């Protein structure tokens, strides 16, 4: 990002002090800039449409339109930026639900500042991000489903296997498309089919599964 314009971030959180703290942290990074902030979901959606930021940092628990409802609305807008949930909740249901409904990552608010800044850089670059403390949470979710869900990677086509490998490496659709010399829309179709065949809820869960089971 050093040879490009700074990555743009929109903050959607109902706590002014937290937004201020995140802005101060981001001000330390010359290649990321906060272009807008909203205290509720409705305002956040309006700003997201007008600003189309590279990254949206979204609180989960907000009065009125909550984070999941806001996430659904943002996904309906087909925005180009990544959407990462930023929450105090490490409950399995919250994490899995957010990822299933299209979040590109899930970060906890008690992260160390330097870890948060690193994660924001990764997310802005198109990578999936997940607080380290949440890996066991997703692993537990996978284990709970294992008894009733048998996943056989051999069900996948060669192309779907290639894409699963790249997802496990944290690559976004755009970079996968370049790597495989196919269109981004084709990648999206393959990802959808792959997740359905493997009975996985999200890209992040797919990545955790690959690493946990040492699929490749």
From Swiss-Prot:
PROSITE patterns to which the protein is assigned, alphabetical: HTH_LUXR_1, HTH_LUXR_2, RESPONSE_REGULATORY
Identification of the protein by name: Nitrate/nitrite response regulator protein NarL
GO biological process terms on file: nitrate assimilation; phosphorelay signal transduction system; regulation of DNA-templated transcription
SUPFAM superfamilies hit by this protein: C-terminal effector domain of the bipartite response regulators, CheY-like
GO cellular component: cytosol; protein-DNA complex
Pfam families: GerE, Response_reg
Residue intervals of the Response regulatory domain: 8-124
Keywords linked to the UniProt accession: Activator, ATP-binding, DNA-binding, Nitrate assimilation, Nucleotide-binding, Phosphoprotein, Repressor, Transcription, Transcription regulation, Two-component regulatory system
GO MF: ATP binding; DNA binding; DNA-binding transcription repressor activity; identical protein binding; transcription cis-regulatory region binding
Coiled-coil region: none
PTM annotation (4-aspartylphosphate): residues: 59
Record function comment: This protein activates the expression of the nitrate reductase (narGHJI) and formate dehydrogenase-N (fdnGHI) operons and represses the transcription of the fumarate reductase (frdABCD) operon in response to a nitrate/nitrite induction signal transmitted by either the NarX or NarQ proteins.
Domain HTH luxR-type: 149-214
Domain of life of the native organism: Bacteria
DNA-binding region(s) from the entry: 173-192
Species this protein is from: Escherichia coli (strain K12)
């Amino acid at each position: 990002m050093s040879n490009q314009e700074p990555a743009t971030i929109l903050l959607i959180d109902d706590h002014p002090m937290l937004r201020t703290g995140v802005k101060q942290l981001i001000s330390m990074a010359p290649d990321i800039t906060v272009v807008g902030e909203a205290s509720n979901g409705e305002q956040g959606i309006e700003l997201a449409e007008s600003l189309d930021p590279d990254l949206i940092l979204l609180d989960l628990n907000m009065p009125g339109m909550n984070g999941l409802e806001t996430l659904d609305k943002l996904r309906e807008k087909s925005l180009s930026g990544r959407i990462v949930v930023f929450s105090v909740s490490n409950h399995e249901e919250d994490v899995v639900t957010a990822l299933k409904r299209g979040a590109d990552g899930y970060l906890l608010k008690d992260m160390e500042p330097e870890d948060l800044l690193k994660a924001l850089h990764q997310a802005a670059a198109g990578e999936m991000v997940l607080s380290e403390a949440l890996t066991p949470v997703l692993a537990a979710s996978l284990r709970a489903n294992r008894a009733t869900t048998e996943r056989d990677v051999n069900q996948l086509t060669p192309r779907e296997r290639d894409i699963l490998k790249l997802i496990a490496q944290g690559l976004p659709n755009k970079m996968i498309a370049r790597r495989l010399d196919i269109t981004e829309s084709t990648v999206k179709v393959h990802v959808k089919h792959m997740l359905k065949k493997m009975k996985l809820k999200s890209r992040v869960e797919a990545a955790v599964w690959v690493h946990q089971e040492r699929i490749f």
